[in-house]
């Protein structure tokens, strides 16, 4: 999955019954750090001191699933800046014969002709702000804006096939592949 917070990654997973195949940094954070409240709205309690533990658990789960040859959905933004690419970190662990797909949940919110124009990004941010307000656990909008900026400059590795969450047939093919894995 790819996209800033509130772009629909977790909703996509739930709507398609992929929870049993999913690893999520946020779910690990909730188990370790709990929930806090911001103006009466629940937020995932982000504790910088536990982030190394969150990622240790995340990668242990990922490595175990890969060793067991299980299809795995990663419910994280999978975006970063300053030359770090979380997808490359994941690819280092994936067996060579695996095909890695990324479902981009942010692309459908952008203008297809000029996706990173100010108008397109502002429109997408309005949608993200509304979704963020309506979701179970909100995220500070400054963080969402930062991840939107990361998306603009983010490069997907060549080995990865990117599918828009709006491309229903391709997305369904991937979902079927995961759900029908034997």
Where are these regions (language model features)?
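Alpha-helical scaffold elements adjacent to nucleotide-binding pockets in ATP/GTP-utilizing enzyme cores
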Residues: 86-90, 123-131, 174-177
């Amino acid at each position: 999955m790819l996209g800033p917070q509130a772009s629909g990654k977790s909703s996509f997973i739930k709507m398609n019954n992929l929870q049993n195949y999913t690893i999520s940094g946020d779910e690990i954070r909730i188990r370790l750090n709990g929930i806090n409240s911001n103006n009466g709205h629940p937020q995932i309690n982000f504790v910088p001191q536990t982030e190394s533990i969150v990622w240790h658990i995340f990668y242990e789960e990922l490595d175990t699933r890969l060793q067991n040859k299980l299809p795995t959905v990663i419910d994280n933004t999978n975006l970063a800046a300053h030359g770090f690419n979380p997808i490359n970190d994941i690819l280092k662990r994936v067996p060579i014969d695996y095909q890695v797909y990324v479902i981009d949940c942010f692309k459908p919110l952008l203008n297809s002709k000029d996706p990173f124009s100010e108008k397109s990004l502002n429109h997408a941010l309005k949608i993200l702000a509304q979704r963020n307000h309506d979701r179970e656990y909100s995220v500070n909008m400054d963080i969402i804006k930062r991840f939107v900026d990361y998306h603009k400059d983010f490069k997907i590795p060549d080995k990865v096939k990117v599918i828009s969450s709006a491309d229903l047939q391709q997305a369904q093919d991937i979902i079927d592949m995961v759900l029908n894995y034997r």
